[in-house]
Amino acid sequence: MAPLACDPTALDHAGATVVAAGESLGSVISTLTAALAGTSGMAGDDPVGAALGRRYDGAAAKLIQAMADTRNGLCSIGDGVRMSAHNYAVAEAMSDLAGRASALPAPQVTGPLTVGAPPSAVGHGSGAPAGWGWVAPSIGMIWPTGDSAKLRAAAAAWATAGANFMAAETAAGGGTMAAIGAQQIPEGAAINKALADASSATADVARQCQTIAAQLNSYAAKVDQVHAAILDLLSRICDPLTGIKEVWDLLTDEDEDEIKKIADDIRTVVDNFGREADTLGGQIEATVSAVAAATENMSHWAGKEWDHFLHGTPVGRALNQVGQAFKGVGEEGWGFLKGLYEVSPNRMLLDPVGYGKTMAGMVEGAGTLVGLGPDGVPGAFDAWKALGKDVTHWDEWGSNPAEALGKSTFDVATLALPGGPLSKLGKFGHSAADALKGLKKPPGVPKPPEVKPPAAPKAPDSGQPAPSGKPGPVAPSGKPAPGPADGPLPHSPTESKPPAGGTPPAAEPPKPTAAPHSGEPKPIATPPESVGKPVTPAPAEGAPAQPHEPVSARVPPTVPAADTPAPSAPAASMSAASGPPMPPTPSLPEPASLPSGPSGDLPAETPPTAGIPHSGEPSAPSSVPPHFPDTPTHGLGDGGAHGPPESDPKNANGHGPHDASLDSGSDHHLPLHPLDSDDLAALAHYTGPGYQELNFALREGALDVSQQARVDALQKALEKLPVYEGAVVRGTNLPADVLEQYRPGEVITEAAFTSTSTDHTVAQSSAFAGNTEFRIWSTTGRDVSSVSMYPDEKEILFPAGSKFYVVSKTVDPQTGRTIIEMIER
């Protein structure tokens, strides 16, 4: 568990700063609504203006609601930070036996801000000039009544609100996140993620305010243009402002054709204006969808409720006891419903066999309680005594009296009801008899199969010298040989993993070329620890070293491969229980730089969960060293969670960290969608030997056709795996120039795949620690632990091209490590 280090006062101050920033956003909203109050009817009531005005009304209402949700969400986040500080202060005060520490007062929850819709833009704006009456009958429409002055006033109000909205939140953002990042608390990453969400929502809202302002200014300009064009056309037949026609027109009355021509020109101008306004209305509607996303994100935080601890108070203790009692009632209530079904007529019709067995068990159990049980069963008194303990939950009163009280109360109340305790006499009777006779014993471990020891070596004939340098086959110890003190560290689950061929599974046993001598027993491997565990095979000649074994620790045997007896493979050792063994499949070849014995070109066996790699995939480069270098060259480092943790190579099930078996009983998440052979091959290749080659090519931007195909296959497989949302950690070594690139407030794009782990303890151990520790809040990372070659590492893998927002960058004064906190974008 990570250490706790919290300054409640500093944390409370940071929360108060966030609340103040939220309240300042409320002031911006109030100023905006006041400015918009005088813009009613600015779009006009003509067909074009009314259509655009209705679109504006919907967008403006959504945008103001998004502003209110952002304000309420930011205040709620601040309240949560202050409540967290209060809880830590209470815990610190309760742990101070001297009574010197004082708790912070519980903060007041900030009330939500409610806003109404702005005034409608649809209404009578500007009036038509007097000369409009000469052409109105020929046009068939009313004067465009939009008021450009009101439109520009509304645009200025929106632009000012957007700028002030962004400035108010930014003023408190960076310093607050830095203050919270300095606290070593479990919820630190979640708080910073919430603040990042608020910052993103604020930026979206401010951007949409500027968009609305630009659209209103554009419409105001179009209104002015159409008004000017119409007045210019009207001036050809009359004074547009007075409507008085020329004298010759009154005398000759030959202006009707001219008026119709002018009316047609005005209709063309108005039609063009309508099309432009319709396009502008579509842009305003697009604003609504962008605003809805920000509203949905921040309304989640606005609806949060924050409570403070009741521990150590009489009210808290009383509520805890009541809750435990109701928990017991609920558990027994569920059992009551199940018992009611078991003795119901419906079950008799649906499951007559099961119903008959239940009733027979009740009769037999009742006989035990009245002393009519089979021979060797305890008497009636002892049976009733055991039954009473079951009904009253006697053994649970010492550990959880409140829950035991709830269970006992429910059982006593439903004692004689169908489905109650008396309906379970068969079960209780058998339980009492078994308990009193000591029949309930833990299942025994099956006896391992008897294995004959290897026969003693045959004595040489007289006159022949005894062969020297021919040691017999040695059974493996089941544990990897320890590496040298100055050798490389074990593969870190958050840093680097072995290259191709560096951590192969057990090698396939060599097959003898000649039949063994008759009468000689065949040496075999050490017997398994228990039934169901695979026998650890002896490593093949020339096989590469195990993860914790240096290359120099391997001594090639001197016995020829033809005379070496084949050890039992893991699949063969389980053949009696699980069917015929799976045939071994060849894995990637061993690096050329490693020494090999006579049988060094024998193929290695692929682990059960590794899948079958693509045929024709290129092998790992022969120049790769047996251990990946500690210092990566780019980005987060080339490491992944691909190496055994610093612990006993064998876990409780007898499997080593590399013995990934589907029946290992591990608690990993299953894939969301079925994985085909291509998916398994891609995952096995990456979590095994192929990560280094792919990541190097991705960072250099030099993927060949084969590598691109493997990257695409891995990306496709990751999409089928479950998403992990939560904190992950990664340890690595970064050079100073790469470390300098991680600056708070910037977004880092990782071109390669990024491996992390959920096991914080293993990642921070001395064996795996580098000079840098990344603490990342994952939102779309994929849990590959169920299909990894090393499932114990609990790996969370981010796809290539993932983006991370750098929240903070600090140096741990105790360890000297750089701690970088990031949020996946």
UniProtKB/Swiss-Prot annotation:
GO CC terms, sorted: extracellular region
Compositionally biased region (Pro residues): 443-457, 468-491, 580-589
Swiss-Prot/TrEMBL catalytic activity: L-arginyl-[protein] + NAD(+) = N(omega)-(ADP-D-ribosyl)-L-arginyl-[protein] + nicotinamide + H(+)
One function term, GO molecular function aspect: NAD+-protein-arginine ADP-ribosyltransferase activity
TR mART core domain sequence ranges: 650-825
InterPro entries assigned to the protein according to its UniProt record, in alphabetical order: ADP-ribosyltransferase, ADP-ribosyltransferase_ARG
Enzyme Commission designation: 2.4.2.31
Binding site for NAD(+): 687-699, 730-733, 750, 795
Main location: secreted
Stretch forming the signal peptide: none
Top-level taxon in the UniProt lineage: Bacteria
Active site: 730, 755, 795
Region annotation (Disordered) ranges: 435-673
Similarity-based family: Belongs to the Arg-specific ADP-ribosyltransferase family.
Function: A probable mono(ADP-ribosyl)transferase, it may ADP-ribosylate Arg in target protein(s).
Full protein name: Putative NAD(+)--arginine ADP-ribosyltransferase Mav
Lineage: Bacteria, Bacillati, Actinomycetota, Actinomycetes, Mycobacteriales
